[in-house]
Amino acid sequence: MLRLPAVLRQMRPVSRALALHLTRAYAKDVKFGADARALMLQGVDLLADAVAVTMGPKGRTVIIEQSWGSPRVTKDGVTVAKSIDLKDKYKNIGAKLVQDVANNTNEEAGDGTTTATVLARSIAKEGFEKISKGANPVEIRRGVMLAVDAVIVELKKQSKPVTTPEEIAQVATISANGDKEIGNIISDAMKKVGRKGVITVKDGKTLNDELEIIEGMKFDRGYISPYFINTSKGQKCEFQDAYVLLSEKKISSVQSIVPALEIANAHRKPLVIIAEDVDGEALSTLVLNRLKVGLQVVAVKAPGFGDNRKNQLKDMAIATGGAVFGEEGLNLNLEDVQPHDLGKVGEVIVTKDDAMLLKGKGDKAQIEKRIQEIIEQLDITTSEYEKEKLNERLAKLSDGVAVLKVGGTSDVEVNEKKDRVTDALNATRAAVEEGIVLGGDCALLRCIPALESITPANEDQKTGIEIIKKTLKIPAMTIAKNAGVEGSLIVEKIMQSSSEVGYDAMLGDFVNMVEKGIIDPTKVVRTALLDAAGVASLLTTAEVVVTEIPKEEKDPGMGGMGGMGGGMGGGMF
């Protein structure tokens, strides 16, 4: 008989040795003060220099090597920032912090990443310089944030709402690097699906850009399991002419889904299951049949929570001509499903993050009735959150989905153009949301006088305000520099001109920016400055930087091979 305590005693030394091995981390390298800041600043400079060349209408492209496929050619600031990974760990920390600025700006505003990057570099550089001369970094940061708050108030005063399709086209054109075709196509898309409608960007199959309006619904829930993927072109599941099973309840048992699968199989149609959740035996069976016999099925979690989920499922049922199982007041069981209970759609696209139901076969009169119900709810609700959700539902039911198909002669060209189209689309949405200000980063220059009215508590806070005053000139100077002219002279001339005059870098002339349609979304400018100041001023307060020292791998040597070679040599001769 095996005695457990004796076995455990024998294993104890092994366990201790193993635990030590598992918990041991890399050794750390620690740098203090000026040494650490100098290295971080080098990383900030490297990243900012790479991103800054893309700025403005005459900015250059950046070619990025990829681990697979062709190199990527882009003018998109956040794409360039994300691609940079430095060997030196201290430099890399500086670069990664500014990378975060670009990412945050991109996520919140969808554009303005290059502006955010050059602003962050300027604040960090000026801050480090002042700290090296004995200034207090915490007070400098307070001064910086005081100045940023004043600039944001001034930007809101300058901001004008976007009202006409022409203004929408102008914003999109500027963000697309002056491409009027992209500007017009985005303006058309917004006109057709509404300002809050769903607009997606895809690869086209022709040389020209195309706009397609598809009647359908998109929601932010992807496939439950990646085993449902049925195409090699991207991680997604695509079906044509499919049935849709909708359930308010969780589906766990196989018996619940077999009748619907049999109906879909009998009619030779794929089946899309949208439920609160699909798990247990039901999910295992679906995945197994998908892999073994190629069953055309995909399971997706229903979007939203509580009443919002119920409403969205009901919208889907009306749009597709189906029924919602588990709905209160309806005595429908999944086991008793009939063909008329299943919704019908012309096309389904499901990725890991979202799903699109396109060309629904629902009754037009029922859809119109549902739209009117939502409009009535909009009129009586006072909650901003409720209004937002109702508008989303309204857009999905009434306007459909606009698909921008980007054309080109090669994958490299299409990908570069897609970056610009996505930027332009995001900028346009931001402009519709918060309005527009002067473009070419002239709006930041016009905010400089507002800093004079701030009363700092001490000299170091005053230094922080001066840093922002100097920093606000940097984006306009960078645009001018990329156009081949002296940035400081251009900025000086803009400051001496009337409030609506700025520099048109494409034409190399001073013009009325509003009349020329050179405008920026207020949200983009505001977010770029706020994110840059927050991270860069925090960077200047760093006194110690800790990094890991990678463990050196021992060279196993080639002794065995050498011996083998010798033996083979002897044999051959």
Curated annotation (Swiss-Prot):
This is 60 kDa heat shock protein, mitochondrial. The keyword Chloroplast does not apply. Homoheptamer arranged in a ring structure. The functional units of these chaperonins consist of heptameric rings of the large subunit Hsp60, which function as a back-to-back double ring. Interacts with 2 heptameric Hsp10 rings to form the symmetrical football complex. Interacts with HRAS. Interacts with ATAD3A. Interacts with ETFBKMT and EEF1AKMT3. Interacts with MFHAS1. The gene is HSPD1. Residues 1-26 form a transit peptide. There is a cross-link at residue 551 (Glycyl lysine isopeptide (Lys-Gly) (interchain with G-Cter in SUMO2)). Its EC number is 5.6.1.7. The modification Phosphotyrosine is found at residue 90. The modification N6-acetyllysine is found at residues 75, 82, 87, 91, 125, 130, 133, 156, 191, 202, 205, 218, 236, 249-250, 269, 292, 314, 352, 359, 389, 396, 469, 481. It is found in: Mitochondrion matrix. The modification N6-succinyllysine is found at residues 31, 82, 125, 133, 191, 202, 205, 218, 236, 250, 301, 352, 396, 481. Keywords: Acetylation, ATP-binding, Chaperone, Isomerase, Isopeptide bond, Mitochondrion, Nucleotide-binding, Phosphoprotein, Transit peptide, Ubl conjugation. The modification Phosphoserine is found at residues 67, 70, 410, 488. Pfam families: Cpn60_TCP1. Chaperonin implicated in mitochondrial protein import and macromolecular assembly. Together with Hsp10, facilitates the correct folding of imported proteins. May also prevent misfolding and promote the refolding and proper assembly of unfolded polypeptides generated under stress conditions in the mitochondrial matrix. The functional units of these chaperonins consist of heptameric rings of the large subunit Hsp60, which function as a back-to-back double ring. The modification N6-malonyllysine is found at residue 133. InterPro entries: Cpn60/GroEL, Cpn60/GroEL/TCP-1, GroEL-like_apical_dom_sf, GROEL-like_equatorial_sf, TCP-1-like_intermed_sf.
